[in-house]
Amino acid sequence: MKIGVIMGGISSEREISLQSGKSIIENINKEKYEVLPIVIDKKEDIINKSKGIDFALLALHGQFGEDGTVQSVLQTLGIPYSGCGPLSSAMCMDKDVSKSVLEANGIRTAPWINLRKGDNIDFNKINELGYPVVVKPTHGGSSVATFIVKEEKEIENCVSEAFKWDSEVMIEKFIKGDEITCPVYNNKMLPVIAIKPKAEFFDFTSKYQDGGAEEIVVELEAELHKEVEKMALETYKALKCEVYSRVDMIVTEEGVPYILEINTLPGMTKNSLIPKSAAALNIGFSELIDMIIQDSLKISR
């Protein structure tokens, strides 16, 4: 079977995607699969470079990769691919939409407002959220252009900076607590990982620099584990995820979990969280890649 490992892309997360692709190529079972690296430099590459492959193993992150666009193209070309479908990918990439779906399903997430380019900033609504707030691109990833804002005078600059990366910007109540990530694979939660960043929050540097954060598999207290698992699985289901995704949460000092966001194509670098979680179940990286390929092939699209 000829596997195209699709990486690169045109988003702000291109370099991380290339790292994910490289790690996958290094660890995939080459006795079982013929592997073709496919680097996307421009949008039409997904059509021109995917010809002749039997399966697309997606290592893309961010817009045009994680937002359902590439998934739709591959589906149109009749090429099976890894992970979530177009609708789920698009919903999870758009934090305003995903949070609206969560809220409609009674799943706890921080209150927020969403701005489009040209909208006036409603400072009264921001005051209702209460400072500090988080300002970030609505369709962003890897915490690029994400700011914790503690007072009103900082808002305009941070919103302007976030708009450099996206056509929409989210302003969300900052929830103080411990960040955890909950990988979900085929409707089952894998071991939870606690994230203790050296910075104020789990920013770009913390995520991708060696030693930027301490990431450890944790055993949560029984009641909290039960609630976290319920929320992770309900989120996976509500947003129509398939095969695997990563549900990120924040747990307050009082032990109340909130959904932060959902990653439909989580990182697959040596520092990445899903391989760490799978390793806690004695599932090696090569085996995990094989599972993702085989389970994705079972989906009828």
Curated annotation (Swiss-Prot):
Residues that hold Mg(2+) 2 according to the record: 261, 263
Subcellular location per the Swiss-Prot or TrEMBL entry: Cytoplasm
Binding locations of ATP: 126-181
Cofactor(s) demanded: Mg(2+); Mn(2+)
Domain ATP-grasp: 99-294
Pathway noted in the entry: Cell wall biogenesis; peptidoglycan biosynthesis
UniProt: Mg(2+) 1 binding residues: 248, 261
Note describing how the cofactor binds: Binds 2 magnesium or manganese ions per subunit.
Main location group: cytoplasm
Record's keyword annotation contains Cell wall biogenesis/degradation: yes
Reaction catalysis annotation: 2 D-alanine + ATP = D-alanyl-D-alanine + ADP + phosphate + H(+)
Record-listed E.C. numbers: 6.3.2.4
PROSITE patterns: ATP_GRASP (PS50975), DALA_DALA_LIGASE_1 (PS00843), DALA_DALA_LIGASE_2 (PS00844)
UniProt KW keywords: ATP-binding, Cell shape, Cell wall biogenesis/degradation, Cytoplasm, Ligase, Magnesium, Manganese, Metal-binding, Nucleotide-binding, Peptidoglycan synthesis
Superkingdom of this protein's organism: Bacteria
Xref: HAMAP family: Dala_Dala_lig (MF_00047)
Purpose: Cell wall formation.
Family, similarity comment: Belongs to the D-alanine--D-alanine ligase family.
Designated name of the protein: D-alanine--D-alanine ligase
